[in-house]
């Protein structure tokens, strides 16, 4: 066992070999490296699978041995302090390592086929492997300095991955937006780390936890500066807020969908957004002893839960809908951390990671099947209003996507049901208001997830549809409403152009079929070997190399929730997660959460309540988008109902219009940032530039010009005779003395 721990440092460096070898190959023998480019997927998957086996072995030893292992090397040593680096193996490290390795391996297998026609295939696998290296290095870090180094590497990888298709302007803008937004959080994290070092004199987690735990009474008695400690903890949390897309630094997450779909799956399941959650989990023993910080964490979490769910309601891009879903689910995890439910937070991190990876890879399979028909423009191939009726074309993708959807909705016995219900149960004990918001959001989650599922897989394929006002399909808008006569035309589907300055119009215009855009094909040709791809009249199922990861993730989504189920007294040995979490330096303050007496009656009551809310959301989604709506439409019941209750209909349309505009325009938060912050900063910069150029430089230039002209005037007065110089000097001195005399005596 000791030998296994001794070689644990190799975990992050195994996958580093792939980007190094690809880089050397492209530098030294580029033709040969490119000719065997598909072979590079094998070492990428192989090395990450070794990491997975190694992490699994560590986890088994953690569960059986309840041990923590830390090894440090001194980096710099002086009389006052020393800077060390090394690795820390505890339950949190092993959990995150397995999560990163399993999700990363599935994504790499999937990507081999998904990216096979892309010119950036080698660059893609280099980015992905380095992404995994950075995240694995982050989770084994034993101190804040090492965490910050790998934290920045994770941010760099996300920047490169989001802007993978950098020739596309939207992708270039998205990676810059993600980079700048995360700069805010990273700067806060750096200041927080330096502040903690100023207080405690150490970067090591163990030292920080011991110092702050021993100083609880001192903080209350103002022996330590509690205000400064609160400021430092808030700055640390700011880094997690930006990385995990929490309000108000969440704005980068939907734009990050400009990258390839496998990268989106990795970012949302196991790397980028998981980094912020990991940081909060690692620092939780420290954050709990600092006043008000836990309240701040839970408040930000519950705001993000609700905001992410509302912003997902009206999105038409399938990946952006999933992005806002990720934001909301991360809010649940942050809420659990803020209320001290460490176990529930990690449990939901595990279940959500596999469910969300399944959904993102499923969406990639859908996009992959739609691209030959619609072209390679994300505005079309990712747009749900062009989909529909895909069940018969992509049945395996449909089945796995439905499984992930049900899991995220919290339907038993799937994975997310167990973890989300534990968070809801604990939130009732902490704050009824937070619990009501979190419970209500489960209904919104079920609504927007089934809205996504129904728009994508149910109904008819809308890409080949010719607009006809007599057709029932013509009248279905993104909200499931009728368009032509009875219902408000303001809710008809938006045009495919994302430019919000353009007028709203129906995508099912009469006698019009959308064709593949030549400009779009030309744009994508920078990234692919083939300028044009063979077109198909209908979508087709993905290849086996893409379906295999979907099936494995579906199995994990079915059964991974069992690791955290509390079976009650007498069978607590089956509660694997609680036993797993015991050997953790982050668990010293949370033993009360590890071995509770599970009350199945109370659990069943809460579960029935939450599942009922979820089923209500599913029912509403079916009424608006499913076969129930079509049946009502064929029986003409909606029109007759609307004629009787016209005023109610008008009011409901107006209310839905407000909700739609709020959701589609991202809550106007991006607009606020663009108007207030961006323009304000630019205005301040222009004012500063004017002051510097006209005032500061003007005074300096004026002095120089004045000296120049004075010198020129004196030059013409000089004749080269010493007697003249003496005369002018004595005359000036006489005048000065006369003036002084009159000033003193008169």
Swiss-Prot record:
One of its GO terms (biological process) is electron transport coupled proton transport. It is found in: Plastid, Chloroplast thylakoid membrane. The keyword Oxidoreductase does not apply. GO terms for cellular component: chloroplast thylakoid membrane. The keyword Transport applies. The chain crosses the membrane at residues 9-29, 39-59, 89-109, 125-145, 147-167, 185-205, 222-242, 261-281, 283-303, 330-350, 357-377, 399-419, 428-448, 545-565, 608-628, 726-746. Keywords: Chloroplast, Membrane, NAD, NADP, Plastid, Plastoquinone, Quinone, Thylakoid, Translocase, Transmembrane, Transmembrane helix, Transport. Gene3D superfamilies: 1.20.5.2700. Its main location: plastid. It is an enzyme of class 7 (translocase). It catalyses: a plastoquinone + NADH + (n+1) H(+)(in) = a plastoquinol + NAD(+) + n H(+)(out); a plastoquinone + NADPH + (n+1) H(+)(in) = a plastoquinol + NADP(+) + n H(+)(out). It is a multi-pass membrane protein. GO terms for molecular function: NADH dehydrogenase (ubiquinone) activity; quinone binding. Its EC number is 7.1.1.-. NDH is composed of at least 16 different subunits, 5 of which are encoded in the nucleus. PANTHER family: NADH-UBIQUINONE OXIDOREDUCTASE CHAIN 5 (PTHR42829:SF2). NDH shuttles electrons from NAD(P)H:plastoquinone, via FMN and iron-sulfur (Fe-S) centers, to quinones in the photosynthetic chain and possibly in a chloroplast respiratory chain. The immediate electron acceptor for the enzyme in this species is believed to be plastoquinone. Couples the redox reaction to proton translocation, and thus conserves the redox energy in a proton gradient. Belongs to the complex I subunit 5 family. This is NAD(P)H-quinone oxidoreductase subunit 5, chloroplastic. It comes from Amborella trichopoda.
């Amino acid at each position: 066992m000791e030998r296994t721990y001794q070689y644990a440092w190799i975990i992050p460096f195994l996958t580093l070999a792939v980007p190094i070898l690809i880089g050397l190959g492209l530098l030294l023998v580029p033709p040969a490296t490119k000719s065997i480019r598909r072979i590079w997927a094998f070492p990428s998957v192989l090395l990450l699978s070794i990491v997975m086996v190694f992490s699994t072995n560590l986890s088994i030893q953690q569960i059986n041995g309840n041990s923590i292992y830390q090894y440090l090397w001194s980096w710099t040593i002086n009389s006052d302090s020393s800077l060390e680096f090394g690795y820390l193996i505890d339950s949190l490290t092993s959990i995150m390592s397995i999560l990163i390795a399993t999700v990363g391996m599935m994504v790499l297998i999937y990507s081999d086929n998904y990216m096979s026609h892309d010119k950036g295939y080698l660059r893609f696998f280099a980015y992905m492997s380095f992404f995994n290296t950075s995240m694995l290095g982050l989770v084994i870090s034993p101190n804040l300095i090492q965490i910050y180094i790998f934290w920045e590497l994770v941010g760099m990888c996300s920047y490169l991955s989001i802007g993978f298709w950098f020739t596309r302007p939207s992708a270039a803008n998205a990676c810059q937006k993600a980079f700048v937004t995360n700069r805010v959080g990273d700067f806060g994290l750096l200041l927080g780390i330096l502040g903690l070092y100023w207080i405690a004199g150490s970067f090591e987690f163990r030292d920080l936890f011991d110092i702050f735990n021993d100083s609880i009474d001192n903080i209350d008695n103002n022996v330590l500066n509690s205000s400064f400690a609160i400021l430092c903890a808030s700055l640390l949390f700011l880094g997690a807020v930006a990385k995990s897309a929490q309000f108000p630094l969440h704005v980068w997450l939907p734009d990050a969908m400009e990258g390839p779909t496998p990268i989106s799956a990795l970012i949302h399941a196991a790397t980028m957004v998981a980094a912020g959650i990991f940081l909060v989990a690692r620092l939780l023993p420290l954050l709990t002893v600092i006043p008000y910080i836990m309240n701040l964490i839970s408040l930000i979490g519950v705001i993000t839960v609700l905001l992410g769910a509302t912003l997902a309601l009206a999105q038409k891009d399938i990946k952006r809908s999933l992005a806002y879903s990720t934001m909301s689910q991360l809010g649940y995890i942050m809420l659990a951390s803020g209320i001290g439910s460490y176990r529930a937070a990690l449990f939901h991190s595990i279940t959500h990671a596999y469910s969300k990876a399944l959904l993102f890879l499923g969406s990639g399979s859908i996009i992959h099947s739609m691209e030959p028909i619609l072209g390679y423009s994300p505005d079309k191939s990712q747009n749900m209003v062009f989909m529909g009726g895909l069940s018969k074309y992509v049945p395996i993708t449909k089945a796995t996507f439905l499984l992930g959807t049900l899991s995220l909705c919290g339907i038993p016995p799937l994975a997310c049901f167990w973890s989300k219900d534990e968070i809801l149960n604990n939130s009732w004990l902490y704050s009824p208001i937070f619990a009501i918001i979190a419970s209500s959001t489960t209904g919104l989650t079920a609504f927007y997830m089934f809205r996504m599922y129904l728009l994508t897989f149910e109904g008819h394929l809308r890409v080949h549809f010719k607009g006809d006002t007599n057709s029932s399909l013509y009248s279905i808008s993104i909200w499931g409403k009728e368009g032509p006569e009875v219902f408000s035309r303001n809710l008809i589907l938006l045009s495919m152009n994302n430019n919000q300055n353009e007028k709203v119009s129906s995508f099912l215009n009469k006698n019009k079929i959308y064709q593949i855009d030549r400009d779009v094909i030309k744009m994508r040709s920078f990234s692919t070997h083939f300028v044009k791809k063979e077109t198909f009249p209908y979508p087709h199922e993905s290849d086996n190399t893409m379906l295999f990861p979907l099936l494995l993730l579906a199995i994990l989504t079915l059964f991974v929730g069992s690791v955290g189920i509390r079976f009650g007294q007498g069978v607590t040995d089956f509660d694997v997660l609680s036993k797993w979490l015991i050997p953790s330096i982050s668990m010293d303050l949370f033993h009360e959460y590890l071995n509770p007496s599970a009350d199945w009656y109370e659990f069943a009551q809460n579960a029935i309540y939450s599942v009922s809310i979820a089923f209500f959301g599913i029912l509403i989604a079916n009424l608006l988008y499913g076969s129930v709506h079509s049946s009502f439409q064929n029986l003409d019941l909606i029109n007759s109902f609307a004629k009787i209750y016209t005023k109610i209909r008008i009011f409901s349309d107006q209310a839905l219009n407000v909700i739609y505009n709020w959701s589609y325009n991202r809550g106007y938060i991006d607009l606020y940032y663009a108007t207030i912050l961006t323009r304000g900063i630019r205005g301040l910069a222009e004012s500063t530039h004017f002051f510097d150029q006209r005032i500061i430089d003007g005074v300096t230039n004026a002095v120089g010009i004045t000296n120049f002209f004075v010198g020129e005037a004196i030059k013409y007065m000089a004749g080269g005779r010493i007697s003249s110089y003496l005369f002018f000097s004595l005359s000036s001195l006489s005048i000065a003395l006369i003036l002084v005399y009159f000033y003193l005596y008169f």
